[in-house]
């Protein structure tokens, strides 16, 4: 068997390291814009998700509260596009969680909110939160 020259071995190792580390940065940040995934989660997804949870727990909602919930649901829906933008998405699992589970769930949620149907809203919200766990299980590192 012919021996593989050292330069080629070294080059392969560097290439593999490069691919692995760029996949990691891709998850944490897009390719051109400064926003990190962590910032979007903390600044947008988590607060809107919490407001929906609180709002739906309150059950009997007034018009003003429904209107606020619609804002939250619409922002989560828009987030399903942000998470796919700027080359942030690393694989099919991410794509399914963002552009299917989160997007479809939040669209359903918005419909339920517009028709002020609390039961439908609760069930759509549970779809929305399935996207969090699906994506986190694969792509969010264990607690630091
Ligand atoms: C398509 C993937 C994806 C989806 C969907 C997703 N997340 Fe995340 N989330 C991540 C990744 C990746 C991180 C880790 C970011 C890092 O630490 O670099 C994260 C981190 C977080 C964090 C921790 C942020 C911090 O300050 O460290 C919170 C909170 C969070 N997500 C909430 C949610 C909630 C709530 C949902 C569902 C409504 C959700 N996420 C849906 C990918 C996703």
Question: How would you describe each model-predicted region?
Answer:
Residues 5, 21-24:
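Intrinsically disordered/low-complexity terminal segments and short unstructured peptides
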Residues 128-139:
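The canonical Cys-X-X-Cys-His
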Residues 9-19:
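Bacterial N-terminal signal peptides
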């Amino acid at each position: 068997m012919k021996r593989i020259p050292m330069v080629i071995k070294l080059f392969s190792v560097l290439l593999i390291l490069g691919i692995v580390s760029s996949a990691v940065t891709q998850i944490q940040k897009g390719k051109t814009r400064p926003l990190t995934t962590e910032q979007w989660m903390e600044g947008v997804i988590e607060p809107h998700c919490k407001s929906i949870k609180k709002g739906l727990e309150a059950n009997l909602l007034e018009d003003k509260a429904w209107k606020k919930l619609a804002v939250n649901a619409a922002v989560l829906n828009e987030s399903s596009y942000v998470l796919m933008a700027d080359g942030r998405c690393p694989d099919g699992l991410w794509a399914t969680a963002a552009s299917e589970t989160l997007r479809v769930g939040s669209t359903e949620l918005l419909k339920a909110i517009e028709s002020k149907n609390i039961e439908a809203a609760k069930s759509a919200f549970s779809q929305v939160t399935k996207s969090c766990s699906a994506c986190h299980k694969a792509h969010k590192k264990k607690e630091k």
